[in-house]
Amino acid sequence: VDVSDNVAISGDDADGVAVAAAGRQPALTGCPWHDVNEMLQAAGLRPTRQRMALGWLLFGKGARHLTAEMLYEEATHAKVPVSLATVYNTLNQLTDAGLLRQVSVDGTKTYFDTNVSAHHHFYLEGNHELVDIPDPHLVLQKMPEVPEGYEISRVDMIVRLRKKR
C-alpha cells in the first residue's frame, strides 16, 4: 500500500465465500462438505476429519463472525468431538492459510471472520457482536506515515456502537 494514496476499502466478494491465500477461489458446488474439502486443499491444508467438521460449521452458513468459544459450542451441539485447543489450533491454521480473517475487538476478544475481503466492522457493545459495515465505498482519506522498514499489511476499522440511553 502506498501510504501517500487514499486507501479504498472494497466490499464483500459476490457470495461471501472465503478466498484462498493464493488469491484463487475454488469452484463451488453448493455442497458444503465438498466445498470445504476444496477450500482446504486449495489453501494447502490436509482435509482432516476435524478440519472438515469445523470447516463445515464455519463456512456452511455463509459470511459470519465467530470466537473460538462460539465455534466450540457449535461443535459440541453438533456432536463433533473436538477440544477447545483443537478449535483454537484449527482457527489459527485457517487464518494462516488465508481462509479466515482474525479481528481483535479488544485485548480479550478475538473473532474469526469467514469473509476475508477488505472490509470494516461495527462492534455492538451490548450484544458482543461483530457486524460487517455494509458500505463498500468506505474510504480512509489519509494514512499515517509508516516508519522506515515497515509496510502496512492490513487496515482494520472497528466502529463500536452502543444503544442510545
Predicted regions and their residues:
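DNA-recognition alpha helix
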Residues: 67-79
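Non-DNA-binding regulatory cores of transcription-related proteins
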Residues: 97-165
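Basic amphipathic alpha-helical segments that dock to polyanions
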Residues: 87-97
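Short amphipathic alpha-helical elements of helix-turn-helix/winged-helix folds
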Residues: 39, 56-61, 74
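Short helix-capping/hinge SLiMs at alpha-helix to coil transitions
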Residues: 45, 60-64, 78
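Short alpha-helical segments that sit at the start of domains
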Residues: 21-53
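C-terminal regulatory/oligomerization modules of transcriptional regulators
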Residues: 1-34, 136-165
